Every structure is written in structure tokens, then in C-alpha cells.
């Protein structure tokens, strides 16, 4: 277990289930009770430090867009259901706002933009980044009813990308619970462990990008995926299987 924890500075956040998968990947079979006992004895079990809170303010003006997700965050193929939201991080030189887009199929963060403001352009640019990187045409893009997501600019970007917009019910954070779960993970595993209020925004941006695109997407055991495959690995596994079947 110590070897697993030493593989990455983020791995010391591993819980019992992810530790069991990590050991299995190394050919070591261990039961839940044994893992629990060893992790507890060594002080390796951690509880969340804080509870995440919503950030964007909902608007009731846009009523024609319905909730197409309905708390069903599962997807059988990549890029059919996408989730997005904004979170705020206090830094030495101001507040940093992060805007990711997650693919429900694998949990992969397919786009991430960060700025010192939470204006609609932040969300529009995140959507454009996802569209430039992957073929997401035809997907549902789900968010809360914050003014950024109900703005004409964002709705225009949704239409240009060939997406279908879905909005949470007013004041119902559970309608986007999986996205909120990502923010909680990011904060627990990274942001609450570093003094962001003493660090400049540009540095915090680099740390977040490195965590998301080199660890979270590519290395971190993701228990919702078969065999705990990391998000990017699960998507690539699916794509390889499709190529084999098409050959």
C-alpha cells in the first residue's frame, strides 16, 4: 500500500475501494477488511475537509429549456452527455474561476478554462475548447441556470457546436451532482492541501492544469469505470474496441 501511495503525491487521498483496485492492478488481492485495518492503523484514511458550495446564480427567466439529464449521469458511449459548471478559488492576487466540462461516459474532463472573472465568455470559451478538441456534436450539455449558461452568447455557442442544452431545476444542486463531485475531489485532493490564498493566480492555474490533465484524466483510479480505469484510458479503450469491431 505504501508503494501505491508513493507513486503520486495525490494518491494519499486514496480511499479503501480505490486502494483495492490499485493493489489488484499490481496483482495483489486483498479484502476490504484487511485494507481498512491497515489504512486505519497507518492513518491513511481521510475525511473530506470542507463541503463544496454552488457558485453561479440561477435565473428563472429561461423556462423553455428543460432538464434532459434528470440526475441520470450514466452514458453508454463517449460524448453523449456533458456536464459543466463554475467554481471559485481564492488566490493571493484575487479570485480564480474555473470552468470545466466533464464527459459522463468516463468522467474525463474534456475542457478546462480559468480566468479572474466568471463572465459568460469563460463558459463560451470552455465549450469552444471542448468542441475543438473532440467530436461532441449531438451531445447534451447540462448546467445549472446561472446567467452565464442562459446568456445569448452561450446558447449561440451551444447551437454552433451542434449540442442540445439541458438546465437544472432552479436551486437544485443535485441536478448537477456529478459535476459538483468533481469540484469536491479537486478541492480535497489538491486545493485544500496548498495555501492558494498565498499563491499567485498564474501558479495556481498551472497546478490545476497539471492535476487535471496529467493525473485526474490519465492516472487516477476512477471507481465508476470498469476496473477503475482512469477516465482518458477508459475512453481510449472504448475507441480501440470500436476500431476492432469496425475492421
Task: Please tell me what each predicted stretch does.
Residues 91, 103-104:
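Short, acidic, Ser/Thr-enriched surface-loop or helix-capping motifs
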Residues 152, 159-161, 185-247:
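C-terminal domain-tail junction helix/linker
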Residues 1, 19, 35, 39, ...:
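Mobile genetic element proteins and their domesticated derivatives, centered on retroelements
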Residues 55-58, 143-145, 151-154, 167-188, ...:
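RNase H-like two-metal-ion nuclease catalytic core shared by retroviral integrases
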Residues 94-100:
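Short glycine-rich loop/turn motifs
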